């Protein structure tokens, strides 16, 4: 397989075509962004850490029956992934109130939610990724059917159940996380993109120290040191 031209660049990754029409190369970047990219930074080694973390978590999920786009890791910062049509929704799973949920609804940060909350956000930078309802998703054609929304919600909850237990065993609270899904060449909905401290909130279960991108958002110290600690616990 040969890596070819750049076809897309996002905030955290570059996507390249290959000589196989069904495969892409995803390259993780060291760039950091927050607040709709109003705040920008860069920390050497961050991309490699996210690649390692996401690879480990996708392999864990695959072992539990969650189908993902991961094929193999080919370098410190690169993965081969299945080409799929990305569904234009960010699926956000929340276990503990913080961030936009606390700001939007006035729920005190750190409040443990009585059940896992799953929200959909429309992936649109111009609109600042607004929260959308099931009906909005159908009206706007973001998914093909109500059944697809049920699949997204069910799979997101399954992912949460697996990861929440996994991280609890490593003294980490999985506060919330964002996942994205795609439709593969056979029409199946599969987990895509990444699961990393860029897309999750992790708090140390003893101290509540934040070990994720909130360190960049809130100027809490080195992102790399925190991501290294998350990886260390994943591998422990």
From Swiss-Prot:
Keyword Ligase (UniProt): yes
GO molecular function term, any single one: phosphoribosylaminoimidazolesuccinocarboxamide synthase activity
Pathway annotation from the record: Purine metabolism; IMP biosynthesis via de novo pathway; 5-amino-1-(5-phospho-D-ribosyl)imidazole-4-carboxamide from 5-amino-1-(5-phospho-D-ribosyl)imidazole-4-carboxylate: step 1/2
Record field: catalytic activity: 5-amino-1-(5-phospho-D-ribosyl)imidazole-4-carboxylate + L-aspartate + ATP = (2S)-2-[5-amino-1-(5-phospho-beta-D-ribosyl)imidazole-4-carboxamido]succinate + ADP + phosphate + 2 H(+)
Protein name: Phosphoribosylaminoimidazole-succinocarboxamide synthase
Family: Belongs to the SAICAR synthetase family.
GO biological process, one term: 'de novo' IMP biosynthetic process
CDD domains: SAICAR_synt_PurC
Enzymatic class: ligase
Origin: domain of life: Bacteria
Record's keyword annotation contains Methyltransferase: no
Pfam family for this entry, one: SAICAR_synt
EC number: 6.3.2.6
Native species: Campylobacter concisus (strain 13826)
Gene3D superfamilies: ATP-grasp fold, B domain, Phosphorylase Kinase, domain 1
Keywords, sorted A to Z: ATP-binding, Ligase, Nucleotide-binding, Purine biosynthesis
């Amino acid at each position: 397989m040969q890596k070819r031209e750049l076809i897309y660049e996002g905030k955290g990754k570059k996507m390249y075509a290959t000589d196989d029409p069904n495969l892409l190369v995803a390259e993780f970047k060291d760039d950091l962004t927050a607040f709709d990219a109003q705040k920008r930074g860069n920390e050497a080694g961050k991309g490699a850490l996210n690649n390692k973390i996401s690879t480990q978590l996708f392999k864990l999920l695959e072992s539990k029956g969650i189908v993902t786009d991961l094929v193999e890791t080919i370098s410190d910062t690169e993965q081969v992934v299945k080409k799929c049509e990305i569904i234009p929704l960010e699926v956000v799973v929340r276990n503990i109130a913080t961030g936009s949920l606390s700001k939007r609804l006035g729920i005190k940060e750190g409040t443990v939610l009585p059940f896992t909350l799953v929200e959909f956000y429309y992936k649109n930078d111009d609109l600042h990724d607004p929260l959308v309802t099931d009906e909005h998703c159908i009206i706007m054609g973001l998914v093909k059917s109500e059944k697809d929304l049920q699949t997204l919600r069910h799979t997101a909850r399954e992912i949460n159940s697996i990861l929440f237990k996994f991280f609890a065993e490593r003294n980490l609270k999985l506060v919330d996380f964002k996942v994205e899904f795609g439709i593969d060449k056979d029409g199946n909905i599969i987990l895509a993109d990444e699961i990393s401290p860029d897309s999750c909130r992790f708090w140390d279960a003893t101290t509540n120290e934040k070990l994720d991108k909130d360190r960049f958002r809130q100027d809490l110290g080195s992102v790399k040191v925190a991501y290294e600690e998350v990886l260390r616990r994943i591998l422990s």
